[in-house]
Amino acid sequence: MGSKVSVEESVRVVIVGGGFAGIAAASQLKSFGIPFLLVDMKDAFHHNVAALRACVESGFARKTFISYKDSFHDSFKQGKVVGINLQTQLVILESNEELSFSHLIIATGSNGPFPGKFNEVISKDQAIQIYENLVEEIQKAKHVVVVGGGSAGVEMAAEVKTDYPEKEVTLIHSKIALADVQLQPSVRRTVKEILLRKGVRLILAQKVTNLDQVTPNVAQENMELQLDKDSEVVNCDLVLCCIGLKVSSSSYRSALGDKMAEDGSLIVNDYLQVQGHENVYAVGDCAYINEPKMAYYAGIHARVAATNVRNSLIGKSLKSYIPGALSMLLSMGRNDGVGQFNGYYLGRCFVTMAKSRDIFVSKSWKEMGQTMPR
């Protein structure tokens, strides 16, 4: 990944957050031989891109949680970051422990509802069991409703209908077009066609008004979802929520509140440095960049930031990150998909081969230097 460099003893990069951006930054710094400490409140990386497959396939969840300690050893610290002191260059944990840094990479990611995101601070084995429990709930249900028709929502609906074609599956979305707004119209049309071909019922341009009164992820008979138009009611026995993604900003809000955009992400320059702080970088979902918040881009950000840490230490020019044409692959179940790469449409065969079969989990196990369980 990169040649090792000689650095002073005072150099230590602290990476806050162990999502896709965090593990990519850690792996890159490790290859450079630059001392780092990856900090996350959980004990394992969660491959949330593959979380939707873990909802329908028993045994798949154990492939989506990868131990930090087994990859990064003493360069990993489990703990919740509650503050950052930029003057003294300290990261403060909930336990009151202070971690010194010469450089800081903020990779806190985003939060959202289960099952697309998993935010509980429990052990890897307990987390895996929660997904296994959801598989059982989906198996029990006769009518599954997915709320939210963005990228996660359309993938979730496709996963359920692909593995359980006999079940009634309904997708409710507040807009007319499905998936990410920045995708080409042809890709978004294909998403709709795939769902309809699979037999998913689509309710578009409508919102659920009583979602806070419904228990998601648990199968129970005669649940009623109220829609905001025509007083329509949808009866179902399982609700899966794929809405409400928010940037995780609590760890840096007090220190960098004046550098935050409206959505809570951090304003960065072309080198991914936080505005006004040459030794502080923001990558992934918490970086304010005009592109969708995706694991693919998070990894690229992280490698650019890690490279810039190295370059700053050895006197080389910093590397710029300039967003290009959108690249996104949508897995529509294990046997279908659609997407685009650098603006070019990608059809079923390519996306199925590239993503839909294992949702890139093997790539993350390889990046973290571990063997994926079978």
Swiss-Prot record:
Q: Which residues form the signal peptide?
A: none
Q: Lipidation (N-myristoyl glycine) at which residues?
A: 2
Catalytic activity, reaction form:
ubiquinone-10 + NADH + H(+) = ubiquinol-10 + NAD(+); phylloquinone + NADH + H(+) = phylloquinol + NAD(+); menaquinone-4 + NADH + H(+) = menaquinol-4 + NAD(+); menadione + NADH + H(+) = menadiol + NAD(+)
Source gene? aifm2
Q: Which InterPro entries match?
A: FAD/NAD-bd_sf, FAD/NAD-binding_dom
Output this protein's name.
Answer: Ferroptosis suppressor protein 1
Q: Explain what switches its activity on or off, per the activity regulation comment.
A: The modification by 4-hydroxy-2-nonenal (HNE) adduction in mitochondria results in loss of the oxidoreductase activity and activation of a novel function in mitochondrial oxidative stress signaling.
Where does the UniProt entry say this protein principally localizes?
other
Organism (species): Xenopus laevis (African clawed frog)
**Superkingdom of this protein's organism:** Eukaryota
Note on how the cofactor is bound: Binds 6-hydroxy-FAD non-covalently.
